[in-house]
Swiss-Prot record:
Part of the 30S ribosomal subunit. Forms a loose heterodimer with protein S19. Forms two bridges to the 50S subunit in the 70S ribosome. PANTHER family: 30S RIBOSOMAL PROTEIN S13/40S RIBOSOMAL PROTEIN S18, SMALL RIBOSOMAL SUBUNIT PROTEIN US13M. The gene is rpsM. Residues 94-118 are annotated as: Disordered. Located at the top of the head of the 30S subunit, it contacts several helices of the 16S rRNA. In the 70S ribosome it contacts the 23S rRNA (bridge B1a) and protein L5 of the 50S subunit (bridge B1b), connecting the 2 subunits; these bridges are implicated in subunit movement. Contacts the tRNAs in the A and P-sites. The keyword Mitochondrion does not apply. One of its GO terms (cellular component) is cytosol. Pfam families: Ribosomal_S13 (PF00416). PROSITE patterns: RIBOSOMAL_S13_1, RIBOSOMAL_S13_2. This is Small ribosomal subunit protein uS13. It comes from Legionella pneumophila subsp. pneumophila (strain Philadelphia 1 / ATCC 33152 / DSM 7513). SUPFAM superfamilies: S13-like H2TH domain. GO terms for biological process: translation. It comes from the Bacteria. Keywords: Ribonucleoprotein, Ribosomal protein, RNA-binding, rRNA-binding, tRNA-binding.
Length: 118
């Protein structure tokens, strides 16, 4: 297994799909990376040479991925909460942020029903 950005990349998968195992890299970014490094996207990871893997590592190092990206996202949410803006308040209360209805539905965000006491 190749190790890129602290993540074990599966050997048996195509490069484009295998790179999506890294948090912050989707299919589009993966395709762009393959194009920049001149790697055929349909090649399996096990068939890549050490030089190709190293060039992939250097390109991925230029992108914010994994722990750094998680930290940035967390800090952005914390900033919204500290500002006290609408989105920050919704985060704080554990409610949907983007205008969805909450009278019914929104169970994923709100959690399980509390139940009515009679």
């Amino acid at each position: 297994m190749a190790r890129i950005a602290g993540v074990n990349i599966p050997d048996h998968k195509h490069v484009v799909i295998a790179l999506t195992a890294i948090y912050g890299i989707g299919k589009t970014t993966s395709l762009k990376l393959c194009k920049t490094v001149d790697i055929d996207p349909s090649v399996k990871v096990s068939q890549l040479s050490d030089a190709q893997l190293e060039s992939l590592r250097t390109e991925i190092a230029k992108i914010t991925v994994e722990g750094d990206l998680r930290r940035v996202v967390t800090m952005n949410i914390k900033r919204l909460m500290d500002l006290g803006c609408y989105r920050g308040l919704r985060h704080r209360r554990g409610l949907p942020l983007r205008g969805q209805r909450t009278k019914t539905n929104a169970r994923t965000r709100k959690g399980r029903r509390k139940g009515t006491s009679s």
